[in-house]
């Protein structure tokens, strides 16, 4: 029998499309979690493995007890029965854990499962496993990322042969069976599999799926990979809808229960775009499991691996180069590394807390969901428990969501279980928090909660807390270490008393005035204050319903920083409520200690200089190209990337650090920006360069994404050059120059 090249066969497509066109995926309001259901007591689980050191068995069992998790998934293959995984399985069962045993043939054996020889090996393996563990395990799963042939190795014929043998053996012993560990949300495979097994009268007891949403970055997002970005909001395939649809598919084919036997966020993938990967993994874990608990669809949900430096709850101390060739979601073969190097990630405490808070809880309903703000109401242990968070980078003041009386009566717990005792939080942000009240207390909301005025923060900025300010018609935010510093800062930088310096004493005085003041918290430092002083009439009309310039500057800087793009650290912003002039707002940030800006560097190169301050042309081009490419890859369209806004700190002649200022116009995406926006930024950045220099610079930039400079790439540069030429001659600058020339002539 020839081996099939892919699991996505014509029959899979036909079965799936027939189901979809028949309305199988129709689920009105399926993206919203249904109210009033109970989260199973044994809802939470994790994948485990051990190694040759039996002390690892003891360690992992101890960590599972700390987590409060009794449900584990363990992978077994042919050689494991006489190895450490078999020993570890016995230890888990003796310790009272409910084990889901995933049986996995070696890759080459799975590829040849259609042959009589391999079927005999598989049958012997099944019989041995069931004789040794069968009566003690909770359930057995057959299939490992079945729809990923390069990981599992199966053909459909081979899998159905393996399933039939396992089905007959397990049915004789009354052992529940799971099938077939489909990876991600790819319902064509679920439909084809269950349709085929129903026809064979071999349906599993439980449908299993690895319900990953890592590809959408955040657990709450609508999946942009289903019919792409512009349709994501229309079809609303978020995590809740995916879970509900998987349950529906199972029930349509006669299976009542569905489980997710593995999912995670790999830290290294998070850090491709965001800072603080381990902290973000912990955020995502809490948000993911809360949404699955709210969906009311899954019988169980497992985190992929307990011990792994990439995706585990515990860091094994290894480097990426030491990661096994086969993905651990396909086969978690062993806990690698040395026991003395194991260290819990923040996600460990996050898992411990969500297990404690939500196991067996009653889900009351969603107070806010799918709009960037998530608040979910549970009853647990005689308490109202609200799990609250915002999407990445966004924040909303608690006072805009709950009444003062409700907040005064609340107890607050961090994502990791620590109590907020001395200083309660001011904001709901991307890091989930738990708010609890006694069961009889009436929780009152200010209004229907939502993200109204845009507010961005870098939630994991070290040694930083955010305090919302409301003071005599002013509002804003300060970023300091504690409440005492916030009060000290407000005394020194009261917006009612902040006054800009005159033109001669300012760093800049044009549409905005920028000046320095002593840092209220550090007498040895200066900070920068920025305030609009001139608004053209059309801007007053167009910007009336936009956030203030100070808020936009704050948001832009915060979005850059959390993406790993340097900008002077924001300290505060203040805005006058109801200000029609649009000029009564202040943005305050650290003063940037730099050596020059790119406008000066490129100006020198354009004048024919071979170097500037000891910097060679190619060094500057290559390093600036990497900086801007990273910014674009991480989702920033800066829109004002002129040379004066790119600051340069010279570490040495071959090592430069760049940072960005004037951040109010920047726009941000969760994904890399398209080429036309990249070119729009680049036209401003290298406007001063002549075309030979531009070609060198653009060669570096485009080469980072495997491209070469083409003719159509040059068009935006010609258009921008023309725009600048016209602006200098017939625009505001041209008119100003003409007026000055006429004045001097007649005087």
Q: Where are the regions a protein language model picked out?
A:
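C-terminal beta-strand-rich structural cap/linker in extracellular carbohydrate-active enzymes
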Residues: 15, 20, 420-462
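Catalytic domains of carbohydrate-active enzymes, especially glycoside hydrolases
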Residues: 41-81, 87-91, 98-102
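Noncatalytic carbohydrate-binding groove/subsite architecture in carbohydrate-active enzymes
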Residues: 157-288
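Aromatic/acidic polysaccharide-binding cleft in carbohydrate-active enzymes
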Residues: 263-351, 365-371
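Carbohydrate-binding surface patches
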Residues: 368-407
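Conserved ATP-binding subdomain of kinase catalytic cores across diverse folds
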Residues: 469, 474-599, 610, 626-634, ...
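Hydrophobic residue at the +6 position relative to the catalytic HRD Asp in the kinase catalytic loop
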Residues: 641, 646-651
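C-lobe/activation-segment region of protein kinase-like
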Residues: 656-739
């Amino acid at each position: 029998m020839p081996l099939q090249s892919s699991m996505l066969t014509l029959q899979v497509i036909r079965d799936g499309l027939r189901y979809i066109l028949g309305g199988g995926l129709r689920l009105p309001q399926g993206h919203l979690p249904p109210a009033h259901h109970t989260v199973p007591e044994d809802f939470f689980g994790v994948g485990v493995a051990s190694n040759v050191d039996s002390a690892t068995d003891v360690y992992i069992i101890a960590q599972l007890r700390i987590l409060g998790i009794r449900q584990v998934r363990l992978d077994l293959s042919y050689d494991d029965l006489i190895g450490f995984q078999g020993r570890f399985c016995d230890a888990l069962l003796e310790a009272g854990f409910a084990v889901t045993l995933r049986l996995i043939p070696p890759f080459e054996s799975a590829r040849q499962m259609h042959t009589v020889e391999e079927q005999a090996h598989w049958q012997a393996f099944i019989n041995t496993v069931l004789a040794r563990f069968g009566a003690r395990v909770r359930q057995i799963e057959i299939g490992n990322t079945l729809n990923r042939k390069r990981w599992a190795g199966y053909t459909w014929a081979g899998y159905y042969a393996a399933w039939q043998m396992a089905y007959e053996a397990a049915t004789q012993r009354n052992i529940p069976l799971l099938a077939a560990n489909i990876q991600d949300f790819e319902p064509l495979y679920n439909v084809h599999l269950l349709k085929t097994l129903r026809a064979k009268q071999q349906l599993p007891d439980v449908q299993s799926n690895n319900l990953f949403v890592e590809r959408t970055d955040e657990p709450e997002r609508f999946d942009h990979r289903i019919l792409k970005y512009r349709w994501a909001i229309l079809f609303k395939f978020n995590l809740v809808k995916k879970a509900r649809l998987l349950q529906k598919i199972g029930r349509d084919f006669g299976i009542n229960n569905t489980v997710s036997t593995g999912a995670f966020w790999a830290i290294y993938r998070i850090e491709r775009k965001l800072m603080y990967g381990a902290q973000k993994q912990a955020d995502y874990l809490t948000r993911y499991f809360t949404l699955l608990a709210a969906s009311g669809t899954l019988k169980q949900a497992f985190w992929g691996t307990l011990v792994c430096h990439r995706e585990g709850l515990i860091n094994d101390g290894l480097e990426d180069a030491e990661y096994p060739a086969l993905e651990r979601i396909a086969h978690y073969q062993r806990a690698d590394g040395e026991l003395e190097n194991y260290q819990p990630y923040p996600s460990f405490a996050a898992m411990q807390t969500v297990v404690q808070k939500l196991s067996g809880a009653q889900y009351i309903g969603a107070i806010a969901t799918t709009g960037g703000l998530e608040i979910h109401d549970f009853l647990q242990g005689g308490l109202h428990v609200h799990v609250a968070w915002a999407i990445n980078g966004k924040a909303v003041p608690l006072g805009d969501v709950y009444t003062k009386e409700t907040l005064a009566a609340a107890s607050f717990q961090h994502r990791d279980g620590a109590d907020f005792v001395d200083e309660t939080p001011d904001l709901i942000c991307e890091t989930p928090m738990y708010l609890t009240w006694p069961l009889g207390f009436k929780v009152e909301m200010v209004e229907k909660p939502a993200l109204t005025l845009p507010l961005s923060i870098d939630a994991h900025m070290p040694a930083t807390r955010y305090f919302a300010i409301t003071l005599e018609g002013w509002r804003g935010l300060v970023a300091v270490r504690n409440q005492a510093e916030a009060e000290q800062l407000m005394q020194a930088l009261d917006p009612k008393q902040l006054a800009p310096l005159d033109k001669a004493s300012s760093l800049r005085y044009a549409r905005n005035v920028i000046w320095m003041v002593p840092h209220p918290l550090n007498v040895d430092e200066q900070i920068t204050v920025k305030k609009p002083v001139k608004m053209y009439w059309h801007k007053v009309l167009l910007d009336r319903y936009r956030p203030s310039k100070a808020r936009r500057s704050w948001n832009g800087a915060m979005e850059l920083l959390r993406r790993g793009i340097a900008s002077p650290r924001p300290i505060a912003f203040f805005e006058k409520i109801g200000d029609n002039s649009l000029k009564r707002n202040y943005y305050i940030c650290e003063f940037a200690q730099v050596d020059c800006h790119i406008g000066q560097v490129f100006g020198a190169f354009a004048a024919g200089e071979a170097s500037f301050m000891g910097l060679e042309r190619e060094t500057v081009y290559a390093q600036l190209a990497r900086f801007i490419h990273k910014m674009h890859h991480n989702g920033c369209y800066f829109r004002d990337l002129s040379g004066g806004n790119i600051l340069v700190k010279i570490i040495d002649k071959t090592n430069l650090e760049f940072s960005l200022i004037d951040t109010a116009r920047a726009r941000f995406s969760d994904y890399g920006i398209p080429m036309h926006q990249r070119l729009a930024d680049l036209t401003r950045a290298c406007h001063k360069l002549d075309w030979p220099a531009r070609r060198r610079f653009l060669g570096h930039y485009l080469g980072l994404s495997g491209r070469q400079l083409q003719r159509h790439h040059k068009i935006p540069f010609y258009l921008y050059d023309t725009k600048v030429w016209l602006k200098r001659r017939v625009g505001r600058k041209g008119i100003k120059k003409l007026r000055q020339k006429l004045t001097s002539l007649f005087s």
